[in-house]
């Protein structure tokens, strides 16, 4: 199953030595990363380590106190919010209430950055919505309204809305947290499929998914990058013990890696 690209635009997003604080409370210190098409970057770490703030800074939803975020070498602050929305798609962890929109209406909202103000969606927009509904396997939801869906079903609709925008960069904060194991696996397979033409970073607490799908894994702890590299380099027993305070190891079986906590 393919998700047709309207136009392939390859872009690079960089965070260089960024710092961020809420008042006197330091949230992130000296964090850097580079997102490019061809690799899936996964950010993980304990609760409160700054992962969501990192995503908000990368998407331009927050401004760093020091350092900078660069989009193809230009400071992200130099882009208008419409220009950013056409280039960077963000799925935040905080969700708006699921109101009584139809599935297609809610997914069409993901296309708004492409639409001139006060203009109706065109055939290409409607085609994109139909494509992502099939791609995400939610066409079977039928005529259900968003507020009639389960949390996991609605999460699939939100991911579909992000995919419908077809941005060259996607940032997703805990996209699989509300999904059952089969749904989480399917979504990660979709992100892996899209990475060849899309720069993708996502946050997850699931170390098994991180080990199985990450090309680059960033382990954040107390606002700092504790370790970065391949899953094998990052998810060592020593690193997991230091960051999470428990014993765990990544076991590799015939079906893939599994995080085992002891």
How should each PLM-predicted stretch be described?
Residues 119, 145-149, 153:
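Conserved ABC ATPase signature
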Residues 170-174:
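Catalytic Walker B motif of ABC-type/P-loop ATPase nucleotide-binding domains
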Residues 59:
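Helix-to-loop junction immediately C-terminal to a conserved catalytic motif
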Residues 67-75, 84:
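Conserved ABC transporter NBD signature motif
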Residues 44-46:
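The feature captures the beta-strand-to-loop junction immediately N-terminal to the Walker
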Residues 237, 242-262:
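ABC ATPase nucleotide-binding domains
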Residues 13, 27-30:
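Conserved structural motif at the start of ABC-family nucleotide-binding domains
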């Amino acid at each position: 199953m393919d998700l047709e690209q309207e136009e392939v635009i390859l872009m690079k997003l960089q965070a260089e030595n960024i710092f961020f604080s809420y008042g006197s409370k330091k949230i992130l210190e000296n964090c850097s990363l580079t997102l490019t098409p061809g690799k899936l970057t996964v950010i993980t770490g304990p609760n409160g380590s700054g992962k969501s703030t990192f995503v908000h800074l990368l998407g331009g939803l927050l401004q760093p106190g020091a350092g900078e975020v660069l989009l193809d070498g230009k400071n992200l602050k130099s882009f208008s919010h419409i220009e950013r929305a056409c280039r960077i798609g963000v799925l935040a962890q905080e969700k708006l209430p699921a109101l009584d929109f139809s599935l297609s209406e809610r997914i069409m909202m993901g296309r708004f950055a492409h639409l001139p103000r006060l203009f109706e969606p065109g055939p290409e927009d409607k085609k994109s919505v139909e494509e992502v509904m099939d791609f995400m396997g939610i066409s079977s939801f039928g005529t259900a309204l968003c507020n009639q869906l389960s949390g996991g079903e609605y999460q699939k609709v939100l991911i579909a809305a992000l995919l419908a925008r077809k941005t060259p960069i996607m940032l997703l904060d805990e996209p699989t947290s509300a999904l059952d194991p089969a749904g989480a696996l399917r979504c990660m397979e979709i992100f892996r499929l899209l990475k060849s033409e899309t720069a993708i970073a996502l946050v997850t607490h699931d170390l098994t998914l991180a080990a199985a799908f990450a090309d680059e894994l960033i382990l954040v702890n107390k606002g700092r990058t504790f370790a970065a590299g391949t899953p094998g380099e990052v998810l060592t027993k020593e690193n997991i013990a230091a960051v999470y305070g428990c014993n765990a190891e990544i076991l590799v079986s015939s079906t893939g890696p599994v995080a085992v906590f002891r």
